[in-house]
Swiss-Prot record:
Species per Swiss-Prot/TrEMBL record: Homo sapiens
Binding locations of Ca(2+) 4: D178, D180, N182, E189
Residues holding Ca(2+) 2: D70, D72, S74, T76, E81
Regions of this protein lying in the Cytoplasmic compartment: 1-238, 290-317, 384-394, 456-583
Protein name: NADPH oxidase 5
Residues annotated as domain Ferric oxidoreductase: 293-440
């Protein structure tokens, strides 16, 4: 081993072939910089510093890695030791990485290596795991060692399994790797086992140690995707509406300004902005006519108008209103300054700006004071509508300040002589819809029949379904529970299928004040009320333990109750288009599964309706599709951070898999894809053994050890390029992607959809 620290010459095979000289030098500079940051003043890395830098959850791996990096057994790692070890581990050959992995798994090797320190692996000998004979330790991995490693892998990936399942995983991997059946896994046997997984050996790394690899150089700036042909094609309806909106503003501004050109530039600007505000402040209500928009979704206009972006257009128009109001105010202020400075002016500046004495305006000269009040109200609504307030547990602040739109409209009627004409039709529609919604919701006083408290603070409500409440898969409703907050209505996606006649399901994630109070109230022994009679009539509370087919035993709380609530809806969403698609890709992140749960259940009910059994011979068959469903294929992708979140809908997914198994002869209509982001993948040395064992046991038992489903849960995040390539290669018809989840992931998916020519629809709240 070369002790000069030149990584180009280290290792039995060298690693210059994997790195250019420039990359080599840049990587060494990066490692040196990170080493100095971690090591501190003493210039060496201790075990505790190594653990903190590695960001591993399980100290087992940190201790194993540290022992193998510390070639001189000094109890600390020097810069030279770190460089030599990482050169082989990060940029070395597959055999170098495999030797390291074997030493990690051969637990008793370190004790024996420590006894021989100073002989074979003396100081300056380089990484002992790369140059020493494998037989220095025990030279093999026994079942107890493998079980210890797999147990640490489980903790590292935040997976909890019972001891019996851990024993089964250990046995499955050990029996597969121990080719000669002598009760121990040798280096050659581990190598042969890994070679069954293509690409794993070449890509083995320690993913959690982000400080091991230098940041990639910035890529060359590419053309913004907004300027690509695919973007313009996929967003043509939105772009057309934006162009029409901008053109209308130019027209309104120009007409109003030209009509007052004799009064000066400031008045022209003020009048132009005022005319645009007449339109914006009235039409902004049209974008929130949920019943009208739901009705339009069922017409041909849904193919022309961007109905799914109504909330984004509402927000955009809100920004425009605030901007125009500021310009309008500044222009009038400049005009008042000029008037007050005129010799013949009987009014001072503050009188023109704040009083009714000048007689400016339609009603008792109130234009100036109402204008100031309007600007303050609009700024308040604008600030309280920001995402940092709405999504940080202060939704009530947004809700109550947004109700001041009623006062804004009233002040606008007093402020401008023509605003009432602009508001007449939109205002009638808006208040008519509000009146209908209020009447229907009060007539539809229903009750919460059952509550299930699920993992990750999710509340599952079962509400008695009114006989006239008709909805489609993926629709949402507004819920009001007077015992939580008398005047607050919150939107939630319906997670039950329309074919479910008796109840409506809602799955509510605790993320704000209202949802947290809902969960905590039912979690308490006296739900919703500290003994108040009108809050709850809980009949029974029972706790049941159930095993998720190999997953950990969960403790769920079920409460049967009779709590009065009100519902308003249903309202349509983009997911209504799913059954008109040919190949639908449903992507849910976390609780974003709720609209797709309704859709998947509806699919299950429709398939059950098509299934028939002969009463004589018990032969079963499935008729062709008799409804309007055009679907040829459905890919459902569910991404969760932790294991317990899969429990929300595991029973539904199990039933879907059973139905698919019965229809296997007709082709696989529905494919499930499950991803757990906290789990490490096969390319990570801290998880390769576990993932291999999970694969082997899943093939043996025909079910996943994490969820109990037949579908194998994949670790990490999806590789969207590979996922969409597979979807495109199936050629099942035009692909439409439906997503419900975080805006950050939506942006990523939107870019991939534009690349592959898929239509993208997002659930908005």
């Amino acid at each position: 081993m070369n002790t000069s620290g030149d990584p180009a010459q280290t290792g039995p095979e060298g690693c210059r072939g994997t790195m250019s000289a420039e990359e080599d030098a840049r990587w060494l500079r990066w490692v040196t910089q990170q080493f100095k940051t971690i090591a501190g003043e003493d210039g060496e890395i201790s075990l505790q510093e190594f653990k903190a830098a590695l960001h591993v959850k399980e100290s087992f791996f940190a201790e194993r890695f540290f022992a193998l990096f510390d070639s001189d057994r000094s109890g600390t790692i020097t810069l030279q030791e770190l460089q030599e070890a990482l050169t082989l581990l990060i940029h070395g050959s597959p055999m170098d990485k495999l030797k390291f992995l074997f030493q990690v798994y051969d637990i008793d090797v370190c004790a024996r290596q420590g006894a021989s320190a100073g002989t074979e692996w003396g100081a300056g000998a380089g990484p002992h795991w790369a140059s020493s004979p494998l037989g220095t330790g025990s030279g093999s991995i026994d079942p107890d060692e493998l079980r210890t490693v797999l147990q640490s892998c489980l903790r590292e990936s935040a997976i909890s399994l019972p001891d019996e399942k851990l024993d089964q995983l250990t046995l499955a991997l050990f029996e597969s790797a121990d080719a000669d059946g002598n009760g121990a896994i040798t280096f050659e046997e581990l190598r042969d086992e890994l070679q069954r997984f293509p690409g794993v050996m070449e890509n083995l790394t320690i993913s959690a140690a982000h400080w091991l690899t230098a940041p990639a150089p910035r890529p060359r700036p590419r053309r913004p995707r907004q300027l690509t042909r695919a973007y313009w094609h996929n967003h043509r309806s939105q772009l057309f509406c934006l162009a029409t909106y901008a053109g209308l503003h130019v027209l309104l501004f120009g007409l109003a300004a030209s009509a007052h050109r004799d009064l000066g530039a400031s008045v022209m600007v003020a009048k132009g902005c005022g005319q645009c505000l007449n339109f914006d402040c009235s039409f902004i209500a049209v974008l929130m006519l949920r019943r009208c928009l739901t009705w339009l979704r069922a017409t041909w206009l849904a193919q022309v108008l961007p109905l799914d972006q109504n909330i984004q257009f509402h927000q955009l128009m809100g920004y425009v209103v605030v901007g125009l109001s500021l310009v309008h105010t500044v222009a009038h202020t400049v005009n008042f300054v000029l008037q007050a400075q005129a010799e013949a002016s009987p009014f001072q500046f503050w009188e023109l700006l704040l009083t009714t004495r000048p007689g400016i305006g339609w009603v008792h000269g109130s234009a100036s004071p109402t204008g100031v009040a309007l600007l303050l109200l609009l700024l308040l609504m604008f600030i309280c509508s920001s995402s940092c307030i709405r999504r940080s547990g202060h939704f009530e602040v947004f809700y109550w300040t947004h109700l001041s739109y009623l006062l804004v409209w009233l002040l606008l009627i007093f402020h401008g002589p023509n605003f009432w004409k602009w508001l007449l039709v939109p205002g009638i529609l808006f208040f008519l819809e509000k009146a209908i919604g209020l009447a229907v919701s009060r007539m539809a006083a229903v009750c919460i029949m059952e509550v299930n408290l699920l993992p990750s603070k999710v509340t599952h409500l079962l509400i008695k379904r009114p006989p006239f409440f008709h909805y489609r898969p993926g629709d949402y409703l507004y819920l009001n529970i007077p015992t939580i907050a008398r005047y607050e209505w919150h939107p939630f996606t319906i997670s039950s299928a329309p074919e479910q006649k008796d109840t409506i399901w809602l799955h509510i994630r605790s993320q704000g004040q209202w949802t947290n109070r809902l969960y905590e109230s039912f979690k308490a022994s006296d739900p919703l009320g500290r003994g108040s009679k009108r809050l709850s009539r809980s009949v029974t509370m029972r706790k049941s333990q159930r095993s998720s087919k190999g997953s950990e035993i969960l403790l769920e709380k079920h409460k049967f109750c009779n709590i009065k609530c009100y519902i308003d809806g249903p309202y349509g969403t983009p997911t209504r288009r799913i059954f008109a698609s040919e190949h639908a890709v449903l992507i849910g992140a976390g609780i974003g599964i709720t609209p797709f749960a309704s859709i998947l259940q509806s699919i299950m009910y429709r398939h059950q309706k098509r299934k028939h059994t002969c009463p004589s011979c018990q032969h079963s068959w499935i008729e062709g599709v008799q409804d309007n469903m055009k679907l040829h294929k459905v890919d459902f992708i569910w991404i969760n951070r932790d294991q317990r979140s899969f429990e929300w809908f595991v029973s539904l997914l199990t039933k879907l898999e059973m139905d698919q198994a019965e229809e296997a002869q007709y082709g696989r209509f529905l494919e499930l894809h499950m991803y757990m982001t906290s789990a490490l993948g096969k390319n990570d040395m801290k998880a390769i053994g576990l993932q291999m064992a999970l694969d082997l046991l899943a093939n043996k038992e025909k079910k996943d050890s994490i969820t109990g489903l037949q579908t194998r849960t994949q670790p990490g995040r999806p590789d969207w390029s590979k996922v969409f390539q597979k979807v495109a290669a199936e050629k099942k018809g035009k692909v439409q992607v439906f997503f419900c989840g975080s805006p950050a992931l939506a942006k990523v998916l939107k870019g991939h959809c534009e690349k592959f020519g898929f239509r993208f629809f997002q659930e908005n709240f």
